[in-house]
């Protein structure tokens, strides 16, 4: 039992090293490519794509994730599946924690959004939404929500990571965020998701459950 705990601890530390290394590499790289990505988005605008991306951005916010998580948690609880009830609850908590973390950082940094005409990109503490670009709250919340599912069950959750990726792209397409805003948000989301996934218990037998685990 001790060896198993030590193995899980070591594996957990390795994941934190990976997340930290990704942040060190990806955030500076994305800052470098911000201007290029902004120019690409401007060049590839179309009315149809913009309408679609606006819809994705609108329905990809945290309230929609919370409603989905609550519905799934209630279904799992009703079906008697303790493991999935806990997973869906962890997804909800991760979504909330990532959203709060992103909010604190964006208010503290005061980064201007791409559609704001200003020479100063970073302006210090600001409450105005026009200067709350870094990081993307939509992306952080969605990534935390679905990455928690992926950490809990990669076979089920891996494909759903396409959802936060689409939401992140939509936020850039509608000129709400820079590339580095969504990259930083995704890293926050993954970190929060892993933090929550570490606190989930192992598989639980549910003899009366109608859901396979």
Each language-model region and where it sits:
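N-terminal transmembrane-helix/juxtamembrane module of multi-pass inner/ER membrane proteins
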Residues: 2-70, 106-128
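Membrane-helix interface segments
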Residues: 48-49, 81-86, 153-159
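Alpha-helical transmembrane segments in multi-pass membrane proteins
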Residues: 26, 90-94, 98, 102, ...
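Hydrophobic, aromatic-rich transmembrane alpha-helices
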Residues: 68-79, 142-150
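Membrane-embedded catalytic cores of phosphoryl/pyrophosphoryl-handling enzymes
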Residues: 3-17, 118-213
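Interfacial segments of alpha-helical transmembrane regions
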Residues: 16-17, 72-103
């Amino acid at each position: 039992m001790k060896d198993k705990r030590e193995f899980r601890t070591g594996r957990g530390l390795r994941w934190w090293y990976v997340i930290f290394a990704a942040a060190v590499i990806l955030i500076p790289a994305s800052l470098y490519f911000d201007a290029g990505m902004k120019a690409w988005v401007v060049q590839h605008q179309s009315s149809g794509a913009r309408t679609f991306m606006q819809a994705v951005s609108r329905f990809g916010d945290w309230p929609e994730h919370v409603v989905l998580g609550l519905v799934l948690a209630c279904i799992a609880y009703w079906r008697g599946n303790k493991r999935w009830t806990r997973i869906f609850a962890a997804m909800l908590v991760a979504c909330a924690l990532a959203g709060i973390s992103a909010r604190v950082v964006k208010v503290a940094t005061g980064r201007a959004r791409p559609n704001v005409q200003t020479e100063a990109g970073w302006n210090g503490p600001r409450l105005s939404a026009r200067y709350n670009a870094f990081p993307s709250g939509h992306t952080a919340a969605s990534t935390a929500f679905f990455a928690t599912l992926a950490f809990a069950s990669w076979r089920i959750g891996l494909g759903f990571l396409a959802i936060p990726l689409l939401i992140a792209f939509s936020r850039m397409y509608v000129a709400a965020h820079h590339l580095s805003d969504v990259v930083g948000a995704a890293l926050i989301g993954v970190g929060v998701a892993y933090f929550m996934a570490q606190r989930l218990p192992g598989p639980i037998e549910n003899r009366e459950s109608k859901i396979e685990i």
